[in-house]
Amino acid sequence: MGDMGDPPKKKRLISLCVGCGNQIHDQYILRVSPDLEWHAACLKCAECNQYLDETCTCFVRDGKTYCKRDYIRLYGIKCAKCSIGFSKNDFVMRARAKVYHIECFRCVACSRQLIPGDEFALREDGLFCRADHDVVERASLGAGDPLSPLHPARPLQMAAEPISARQPALRPHVHKQPEKTTRVRTVLNEKQLHTLRTCYAANPRPDALMKEQLVEMTGLSPRVIRVWFQNKRCKDKKRSIMMKQLQQQQPNDKTNIQGMTGTPMVAASPERHDGGLQANPVEVQSYQPPWKVLSDFALQSDIDQPAFQQLVNFSEGGPGSNSTGSEVASMSSQLPDTPNSMVASPIEA
């Protein structure tokens, strides 16, 4: 008989609180997935001491529990410019490992907002647009130094194909030079550039209908728009080839300017922020120990009923119990509904 009494003792589990280490005798046990159990009074945020229960989102990191607000504040991804976190509906701009709000994705020198398709340099002290980067580079390297990969070989403004015109050539020579045909560039304003770049970021090869819409929106001629897209595609292709060659020659090569490290990049389209949390929220379950279930059932039902006797046998888990899965299911249908979910894991009273 002594051997027959051992198996039930082995099956009984003792719930220990992760917070205080003591055994849990409370009416309710808070379980943090997958197998952490707490007193209701011990499950609190490690920062603000807010009590956590099944109605809250709980995060566990390095053995400490946090509410959602404090976890995002401490460990969530923040904007590299304003150091403010992101909501799940925010669109963000990325530059290597740094993430920015769309409004914060600006040149630190001129405060111009960078849009998809813009060229910029990522340095230790922030983002620099192409123009300001070249100004600092020329001042640092001097006018006689050879052009670096980031130096423009043409005007910084995005220019379309020039149209023909006649004007006298001004040369500082003593002898008079004859007039000749020169090419005048069509300089685009900021609004026109923004429209063209936005369209290019969405589709580098627009169809005829889209080009007609761009003509109406920008006031430029179809030929200017067509050539602008051709030049832009050619320029991006050359830059891509150049960057690949530089990466192959010197994988860790970066442009060092006045002690600052600048990495040439091209702004991509904004993307939705996915939260960036380094841990997933865990579920907190509240359940009653089996002894509490038996007590409530005994107060509301006749203890001589077969269902109650079967529930007692199932809780004891003795070897003489013949309860099956179907009998347990039939017993559960006779139990009164309770506001809390019950977990069928036995606990030592």
Swiss-Prot record:
Alphabetic keyword roster: Activator, Developmental protein, Differentiation, DNA-binding, Homeobox, LIM domain, Metal-binding, Nucleus, Repeat, Transcription, Transcription regulation, Zinc
Residue ranges for the DNA-binding region feature of this UniProt entry: 181-240
Pfam families on file: Homeodomain (PF00046), LIM (PF00412)
Chain spans, region Disordered: 312-349
Domain LIM zinc-binding: 17-70, 79-133
GO biological process: atrial septum morphogenesis; axonogenesis; canonical Wnt signaling pathway; cardiac cell fate determination; cardiac muscle cell myoblast differentiation; cardiac right ventricle morphogenesis; cell population proliferation; endocardial cushion morphogenesis
Biased composition (Polar residues): 321-343
SUPFAM superfamilies: Glucocorticoid receptor-like (DNA-binding domain), Homeodomain-like
GO molecular function: bHLH transcription factor binding; cis-regulatory region sequence-specific DNA binding; DNA-binding transcription activator activity, RNA polymerase II-specific; DNA-binding transcription factor activity, RNA polymerase II-specific; metal ion binding; promoter-specific chromatin binding; RNA polymerase II cis-regulatory region sequence-specific DNA binding; RNA polymerase II-specific DNA-binding transcription factor binding
Record PANTHER family: INSULIN GENE ENHANCER PROTEIN, INSULIN GENE ENHANCER PROTEIN ISL-1
Protein name: Insulin gene enhancer protein ISL-1
Species the sequence originates in: Gallus gallus
Name of the gene: ISL1
